[in-house]
């Protein structure tokens, strides 16, 4: 990565498509070190880590990074239902302000009902219980 001159790395560190390979802890730390050198960013597309068969949740680049240089993306279409086409993005604080200033005019295209369903799943604890049930079931089949 050092010799490329790139300033942005887009990665799916957990079960990366199409290989299915998960980045090792040392590789994840290498990504973080690369981003810290200079004005660089990592876009972490974390669309499947919730379904790790490990008993310990996978560490995200966002959680390892002090949240300064990592933009975290995830979706509910893998964890709740493929028909629920809802994703989300978590930005570093300084980018959140810039995003709001430059792109704040965009309106959310997700229907209100779907937003309320997701909010209820999260707030009630049902989402986390669902993830834990699926992970336990997956561990039994492995």
Predicted regions and their residues:
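Active-site pre-lysine segment of PLP-dependent enzymes
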Residues: 2-5, 16, 21-41, 48-79, ...
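Structural motif
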Residues: 7-12, 43, 88-90
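PLP-dependent aminotransferase class I/II
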Residues: 71-142
């Amino acid at each position: 990565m050092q010799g490329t001159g790139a300033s942005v790395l887009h990665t799916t560190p957990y079960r990366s498509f199409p290989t299915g390979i998960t980045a090792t802890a040392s590789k994840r730390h290498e990504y973080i070190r690369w981003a810290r050198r200079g004005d660089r960013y990592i876009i972490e597309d974390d669309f499947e880590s919730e379904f790790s068969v490990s008993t310990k949740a996978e560490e995200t680049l966002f959680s390892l990074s002090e949240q300064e240089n990592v933009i975290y993306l995830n979706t509910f279409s893998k964890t709740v239902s493929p028909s629920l086409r809802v994703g989300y993005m978590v930005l570093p604080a300084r980018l959140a302000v810039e995003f709001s200033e430059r792109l704040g005019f965009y309106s959310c295209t997700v229907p209100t009902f779907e937003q309320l369903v997701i909010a209820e799943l999260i707030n009630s604890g049902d989402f986390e219980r669902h993830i834990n049930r699926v992970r336990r079931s997956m561990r039994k089949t492995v």
